[in-house]
Regions:
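Cys/His-clustered metal-coordination modules, chiefly Zn-binding fingers
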Residues: 79-130
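Long, charged N-terminal interaction/targeting segments
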Residues: 1-82
Length: 130
């Protein structure tokens, strides 16, 4: 008898994102961390209509647990999405950069002094930029 392959368990957020575009408003979810292994921040915004600016924007942080594995943060994100009646969810499939914000946490145009991993690295591919 052939063994059944077990599918990797997906989070409710991953399931929503896999459904694809279902109209506006769209919730966008992006993960950030000091490297490409641990997400210490997640930012979720609502894009109300095509061409509109993302508003509102909410951020969650964790110093001790990867935010992708934190069930409390996951539930709060789902509640945020429901509250703003998002029909679609778009989520990056990886950590896309440093959790610190340019012009807020460090000067514009400079590299974050706390997250050297992301210095000179393309945040979408993870490749080092020469």
């Amino acid at each position: 008898m052939a063994k059944k392959l077990r599918r990797r368990s997906r989070s409710p957020l991953e399931k929503k994102a896999r459904r694809g575009f279902r109209g506006y408003p769209v919730a966008t979810i992006a993960f950030y961390g000091p490297n490409d292994e641990i997400a210490s921040k997640v930012a979720v915004s609502i894009v109300p209509a095509e061409g509109a600016e993302a508003d509102p924007l909410e951020r969650w942080f964790s110093d001790d647990l990867d935010v992708r594995r934190d069930s409390t943060i996951g539930e709060e994100i789902l509640a945020f999405i429901r509250r703003h009646e998002a029909k679609s969810v778009v989520m990056a499939d990886r950590i896309i950069g440093c959790p610190h914000e340019e012009k807020i946490d460090y000067p514009e145009g400079e590299v974050c002094p706390e997250c050297r991993f992301w210095a000179h690295r393309d945040r979408w591919s993870g490749d080092i930029i020469h």
